[in-house]
């Protein structure tokens, strides 16, 4: 993300315009068990987003980010919330809206943030998680509450993916 941002930033600075939209995660600022490498990387992207918002504003460049909470994806969910273990229900129960995010909601937010209608938004990280982080975020923290047999199965699945 850093190298890509630097490369596109050169062009944007030359053109005196642009919007950089980064996708982080709620656990970039709350932390979460079982996803430490991702949390560290996304926290760095979050800091870069805010830092460049100050540094590159003089070039007409805005940097913004979206911090999604639980949105089902094939990658992470197949390893961390496989079907049949009750993890998805536990996650939904933590969210005040009692549901997971829908990808169209994420797309709509992204579309708005890069539009001219959001021209005064700079350096902001918008959380989209149904209110989960307000209740003590880190959607993967609940993994330690699953039964031991399910945990063993989950660990075996994670090792197979590597």
Feature map (PLM): residue ranges:
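C-terminal substrate-recognition "lid" of short-chain dehydrogenase/reductases
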Residues: 2-5, 62, 99-128, 133-134
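Active-site helix of classical SDR
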Residues: 5, 41, 49
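Alpha-helical segment proximal to the catalytic Tyr-Lys
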Residues: 10, 54-58, 119
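Residue(s) in the substrate-gating loop at a strand-loop-helix junction
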Residues: 25
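Short, flexible catalytic-loop segment of classical short-chain dehydrogenase/reductase
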Residues: 29, 67-78
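Active-site loop immediately N-terminal to the catalytic Tyr-X3-Lys motif
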Residues: 30-36, 58-59, 98, 116
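Active-site loop-to-helix junction immediately N-terminal to the catalytic Tyr of the SDR YXXXK motif
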Residues: 31-40, 51, 76-79
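Short C-terminal tail/terminal secondary-structure segment
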Residues: 111, 122-162
């Amino acid at each position: 993300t850093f190298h890509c941002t630097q490369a596109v930033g050169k062009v944007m600075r030359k053109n005196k315009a642009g919007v950089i939209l980064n996708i982080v995660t709620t656990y970039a600022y709350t932390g979460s068990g079982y996803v430490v490498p991702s949390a560290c990387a996304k926290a760095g992207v979050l800091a870069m987003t805010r830092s460049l918002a100050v540094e590159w504003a003089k070039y007409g460049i805005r940097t913004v980010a979206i911090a999604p909470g639980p949105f089902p994806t094939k990658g992470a969910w197949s390893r961390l919330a496989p079907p049949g273990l009750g993890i998805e229900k536990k996650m939904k129960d933590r969210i005040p809206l009692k549901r997971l995010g829908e990808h169209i909601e994420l797309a709509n937010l992204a579309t708005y943030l890069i539009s001219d209608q959001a021209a005064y938004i700079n350096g902001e990280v918008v959380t989209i998680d149904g209110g989960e982080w307000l209740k003590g975020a880190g959607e993967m923290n609940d993994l330690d509450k699953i039964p031991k047999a399910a945990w063993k199965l989950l660990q075996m699945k994670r090792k197979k993916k590597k």
